[in-house]
């Protein structure tokens, strides 16, 4: 049997305050810090910073 994956599901939420979010995974061993990525927010219709929050 294969070992369980070391990836954790996370939620990237828009800092524009629109409530839009993306979900993705990340490896906690190689990236222990929180992610912050510029992505397109379709509600704000521009690129904004998305910050990582815990996926419930």
UniProtKB/Swiss-Prot annotation:
Q: Carries keyword Ribosomal protein?
A: yes
One GO term under biological process is: translation
Phosphoprotein recorded as keyword: no
Alphabetized UniProt keyword annotations: Ribonucleoprotein, Ribosomal protein
PROSITE patterns named among the record's database cross-references: RIBOSOMAL_L33
The GO terms this record gives for MF are: structural constituent of ribosome
SUPFAM superfamilies (alphabetical)? Zn-binding ribosomal proteins
Highest rank taxon of the organism: Bacteria
Q: Name one GO cellular component term.
A: cytosolic large ribosomal subunit
Xref: PANTHER family: 54S RIBOSOMAL PROTEIN L39, MITOCHONDRIAL, LARGE RIBOSOMAL SUBUNIT PROTEIN BL33M
Protein family? Belongs to the bacterial ribosomal protein bL33 family.
Identification of the protein by name? Large ribosomal subunit protein bL33
Organism this protein belongs to: Delftia acidovorans (strain DSM 14801 / SPH-1)
> In the UniProt record, what gene is named as encoding this protein?
rpmG
